[in-house]
């Protein structure tokens, strides 16, 4: 649906058909490799009887005379092409259904789909379910609508909002975002090393196997692996991860398989996931030679024109696939994410180019001067005598035209590697501007934005395109090792993650709990509470077992959301996650929530803890801001110095102007009353670690007979102070004074 929204149905069908370039690559490469006699072609160039026609060097019946390897290559690529065509043919009916959905139900003509804002489409979809609560779900022909709004007759009829629609569209992507955020995927290369060679390899490069040895091999020395490289993701590896993980977790309808939320199937699911990793590793190893050959041919056809037209583009950069998954936020639609990253490219390039490269600059200036001098002489000579341009050979069979192209390319590349003379050197301000759009600032970067360490780390995320291309080629060889040796030990943690971080939402289905913005379970509001290692004692709502439900909770203890339910675990085994493991790293969920609210200002969260979190943030911002502006204090990560760098989200006065002060004040007062009333309640025994915080309110909240506990400081300043933990120094905390802004939406954080 998101693709149709951005392109229109006709454009989408045309785009998908043009994506099937495999046939052209197969046909043209076969012609070049098998159908031309290159010995006759090149030998004839130096003889008086030079061949002047193509038919003189063609080989008759070239396809049938091909070698076995070439024939096998053609068969494999042809099978892949047929697979692509079949997928395209199967997608056409769905695109037509979506076209009818937009045209007849939403009333949006195909010509307007490309320009209609996404919030307007969300509003139209919500109105359909509001005005057609029965017919919209009972019409068997409206498959596109059923996929969008659901067909669960038992679910209460409720108008779909932007959050529900985003959870449906990004149901699978949200799990991948969470897996990368929690660093559950080991993407380092591991190569098994025979025991006799371990003495010749540095011990720092050797690691032990993460899998326990088989009973029959326990007497043998433990296997060691040669491990190198950091977590690195390529398109080939990403495709394999989607197949192994998402193809395993979801059924054909795109819904989470029920067995993944049950503890009793854990062992079978872990073994099944390991087998998928191993099987795909073997499959990738078998087809690796053919994939490399295809990528080389395809890349040559694709990039030659680009680099020929603009040779300096060989030094251009882009974000790596791994960086994109680290930057992306929960429930962030692709077109919004791409727009956010696109706005950071120029500043990111300026930041990378700012760091001193005196030696490189001196060498490139000299190379540019020499290449420019040769090119100038040849160009002037060609202007004086035009015949020299095509007929004068500087070296055998190499005319002035050839060397003008060579020197021009060298000149363009060398100039691209020389920084501009008028560039202002301020890497800290530049990186702050980049963070404003990427929303990524690890803890170890705080206070070090000017350092070479941060520059090197960022350069790995914002890499040269040519290096990304070579990484893609190399990954074809290394992906089998990652799938076969690195990922199988992660299977147990991945299955546990799928089970523990999957919740059921009425009318939406099973989704990743981070994407629900469940502050009661995952909110990083009370950071001062010691870790218990017990599931359920996480977040602000997991009250102390003694008394007083308000202690340390930051005022965010909430009952069951009106729409959300959760699965019951079949087993009462202890949780495998500690308290800190329930929270997203780098406060990804909190900043995703604020970013989603800023992107969809009309959306009102249905979960009380989320609403209270937002209202208290805005209330604190209103108290702290000067007249005419908004500033609040919500920070989950460190920021740099000036320039608005940091982690978090801001909402400026233009967005807040849409929220009437009276309505906001009344709403805040209602939450204050709800909080005052809920402070007399506490959760019962949390010894059952698998009880979800969002179970039915009658099952999880009881009246406390004792006195009322300390509510703690639940203001936004109190929340920010509690965030200042985990060894974070005062100097680092001072960097929290500013936040990034996104799409014209800004909060200025001040403590």
Swiss-Prot record:
The keyword Acyltransferase does not apply. It is found in: Preautophagosomal structure membrane; Cytoplasmic vesicle membrane; Golgi apparatus membrane; Endoplasmic reticulum membrane. Residues 544-557 have a biased composition (Gly residues). It catalyses: a 1,2-diacyl-sn-glycero-3-phosphocholine(in) = a 1,2-diacyl-sn-glycero-3-phosphocholine(out); a 1,2-diacyl-sn-glycero-3-phospho-L-serine(in) = a 1,2-diacyl-sn-glycero-3-phospho-L-serine(out); a 1,2-diacyl-sn-glycero-3-phosphoethanolamine(in) = a 1,2-diacyl-sn-glycero-3-phosphoethanolamine(out); a 1,2-diacyl-sn-glycero-3-phospho-(1D-myo-inositol-3-phosphate)(in) = a 1,2-diacyl-sn-glycero-3-phospho-(1D-myo-inositol-3-phosphate)(out). Residues 43-71, 387-398 are lumenal. Phosphorylated by ATG1. ATG1 phosphorylation is required for preautophagosome elongation. Residues 528-584, 676-751 are annotated as: Disordered. This is Autophagy-related protein 9. Residues 1-21, 93-276, 298-365, 420-465, 487-751 are cytoplasmic. The chain crosses the membrane at residues 22-42, 72-92, 366-386, 399-419. It comes from Cryptococcus gattii (Filobasidiella gattii).
């Amino acid at each position: 649906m998101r693709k149709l929204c951005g392109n229109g149905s006709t454009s989408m069908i045309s785009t998908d058909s043009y994506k099937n370039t495999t046939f052209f690559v197969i046909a043209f490469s076969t012609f070049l490799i098998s159908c031309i006699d290159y010995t006759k072609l090149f030998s004839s160039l130096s003889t008086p009887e030079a061949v002047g026609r193509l038919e003189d060097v063609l080989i008759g019946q070239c396809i049938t005379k091909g070698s076995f390897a070439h024939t096998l290559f053609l068969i494999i690529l042809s099978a892949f092409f047929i697979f692509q065509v079949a997928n395209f043919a199967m997608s056409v009916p769905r695109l037509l259904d979506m076209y009818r959905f937009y045209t007849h139900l939403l009333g949006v003509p195909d010509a307007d789909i490309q320009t209609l804002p996404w919030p307007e489409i969300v509003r139209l979809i919500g109105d359909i379910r509001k005005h057609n609560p029965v017919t919209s779900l009972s019409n068997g022909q409206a498959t596109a609508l059923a996929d969008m709004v659901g067909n669960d007759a038992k679910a209460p009829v409720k108008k779909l909002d932007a959050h529900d629609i985003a959870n449906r569209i990004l149901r699978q992507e949200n799990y991948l975002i969470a897996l990368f955020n929690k660093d559950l995927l080991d993407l380092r290369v591991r190569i098994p090393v025979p025991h006799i060679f371990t003495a010749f390899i540095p011990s720092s490069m050797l690691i032990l196997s993460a899998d326990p040895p088989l009973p029959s091999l326990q007497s043998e020395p433990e296997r060691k692996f040669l491990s190198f490289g950091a977590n690195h993701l390529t398109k080939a590896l990403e495709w394999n991860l989607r197949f192994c993980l998402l193809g395993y977790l979801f059924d054909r309808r795109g819904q989470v398989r029920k067995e993944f939320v049950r503890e009793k199937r854990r062992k079978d699911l872990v073994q099944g996931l390991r087998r998928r990793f191993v099987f795909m590793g073997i499959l990738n190893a078998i087809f690796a030679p053919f994939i490399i050959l295809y990528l080389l041919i395809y890349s040559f056809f694709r990039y030659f024109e680009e680099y020929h037209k603009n040779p300096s583009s060989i030094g251009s950069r882009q974000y790596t696939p791994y960086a994109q998954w680290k930057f992306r936020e929960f429930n962030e639609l692709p077109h919004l994410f791409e727009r956010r990253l696109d706005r950071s490219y120029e500043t990111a390039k300026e930041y990378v180019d700012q760091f001193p490269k005196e030696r490189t600059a001196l060498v490139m200036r000299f190379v540019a001067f020499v290449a420019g001098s040769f090119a100038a002489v040849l160009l002037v000579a060609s202007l004086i005598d035009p015949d020299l341009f095509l007929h004068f050979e500087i070296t055998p069979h190499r005319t002035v035209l050839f060397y003008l192209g060579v020197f021009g390319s060298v000149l363009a590349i060398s100039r691209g590697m020389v920084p501009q003379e008028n560039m202002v050197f301020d890497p800290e301000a530049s990186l702050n501007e980049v963070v404003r759009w990427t929303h990524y600032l690890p803890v170890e970067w705080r206070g070090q934005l000017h350092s070479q360490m941060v520059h090197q780390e960022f350069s790995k995320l914002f890499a040269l395109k040519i290096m990304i291309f070579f990484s893609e080629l190399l990954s074809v060889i290394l992906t089998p090792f990652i799938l076969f040796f690195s990922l199988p030990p992660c299977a147990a943690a991945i299955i546990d993650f799928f089970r523990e971080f999957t919740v059921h939402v009425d009318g939406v289905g099973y989704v990743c709990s981070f994407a629900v913005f469940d502050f009661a379970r995952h909110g990083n509001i009370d950071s001062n509470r010691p870790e218990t290692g017990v599931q359920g004692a996480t977040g602000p709502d997991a009250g102390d077992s003694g008394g007083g439900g308000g202690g340390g909770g930051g005022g965010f203890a909430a009952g069951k959301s009106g729409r959300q339910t959760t699965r019951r675990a079949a087993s009462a085994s202890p949780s495998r996650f500690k308290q800190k493991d329930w929270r997203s790293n780098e406060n990804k969920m909190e900043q995703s929530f604020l970013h989603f609210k800023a992107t969809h200002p009309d959306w009102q969260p249905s979960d009380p803890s989320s609403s209270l979190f937002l209202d208290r943030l805005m209330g604190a911002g209103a108290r702290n801001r000067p007249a005419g502006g908004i500033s609040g204090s919500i920070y989950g990560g460190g920021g740099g110095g000036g320039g608005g760098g940091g982690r978090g989200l801001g909402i400026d006065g233009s967005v807040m102007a849409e929220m009437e002060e009276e309505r906001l004040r009344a709403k805040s007062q209602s939450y204050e009353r709800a909080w005052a009333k809920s402070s007399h309640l506490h959760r019962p025994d949390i010894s059952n670690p698998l009880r979800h915080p969002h179970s039915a309110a009658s099952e999880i909240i009881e009246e406390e007979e004792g006195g009322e506990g300390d509510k703690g400081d639940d203001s936004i300043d109190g929340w920010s102070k509690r965030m200042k933990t985990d060894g974070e120094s005062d100097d680092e905390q001072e960097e929290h004074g500013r936040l990034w802004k996104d799409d014209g939406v800004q909060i200025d954080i001040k403590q």
